[in-house]
């Protein structure tokens, strides 16, 4: 179960202990990534986080403002091989990230300043377990036209997990057969599709992957 208690107790980290050391980050590496990223934080700015995947429906970190936003220059991509959570080393799934090109609609969350240190710890433990992402300070555009600096976790194209082929047909085949302690990989895709619909948003790429998965279910 992915929740605050699991992260605080260490149970979430423990559920990934089967991963090889070249993939699983240590707590020291996670803490260093957080420190390095916050050292680049825009001066005097509150911390906003851009959610484009499960942060849209299960943010875990406490926030005091939420708004719809668009991140220009980045697109959703199931380009990360998933060895834990909703996949295994034997049957890896695909994890969502952002790659260059296009635009992405999502939400921005302003982390609660009163508990900012804890919220960031929870966020980094959740997102940076394997170093599959690169935390980046970006600029998002709100529905009002205003802009905000926001953290976005984009694909790290260097580690073992990155896959260049993230076409809907390719990723759907991997996602269809992947399961793990957090459930099926396909369930994630359908939850993402619903979260987008709940925000009156669409993503053609996500829809293609979801439809391909439905095709597998129909023929199985």
PLM regions: where:
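A glycine-rich, hydrophobic/aromatic-adjacent loop/helix-cap motif
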Residues: 1-220
């Amino acid at each position: 179960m992915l929740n605050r208690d699991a992260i605080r107790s260490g149970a979430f980290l423990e559920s990934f202990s089967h991963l090889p050391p070249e993939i699983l980050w240590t707590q020291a590496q996670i803490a260093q990534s957080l420190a390095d990223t916050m050292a680049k934080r825009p001066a005097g700015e509150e911390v906003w986080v851009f959610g484009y995947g499960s942060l849209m429906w299960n943010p875990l970190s406490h926030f005091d403002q939420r708004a719809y936003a668009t991140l220009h220059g980045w697109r959703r991509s199931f380009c990360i091989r998933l060895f834990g959570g909703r996949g295994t080393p034997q049957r890896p799934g695909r994890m969502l990230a952002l790659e260059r090109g296009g635009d992405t609609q999502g939400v921005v969350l302003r982390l609660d300043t009163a508990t900012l240190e804890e919220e960031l710890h929870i966020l980094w433990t959740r997102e940076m377990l394997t170093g599959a992402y690169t935390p980046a300070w970006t600029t998002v555009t709100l529905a009002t036209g205003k802009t905000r600096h926001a953290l976005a976790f984009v694909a790290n194209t260097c580690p073992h997990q990155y896959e260049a082929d993230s076409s809907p047909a390719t990723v759907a085949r991997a996602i269809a057969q992947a399961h793990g302690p957090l459930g099926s990989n396909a369930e994630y895709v359908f939850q993402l599709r619903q979260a987008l619909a709940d925000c009156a948003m669409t993503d053609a790429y996500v829809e293609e992957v979801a439809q391909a998965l439905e095709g597998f279910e129909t023929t199985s």
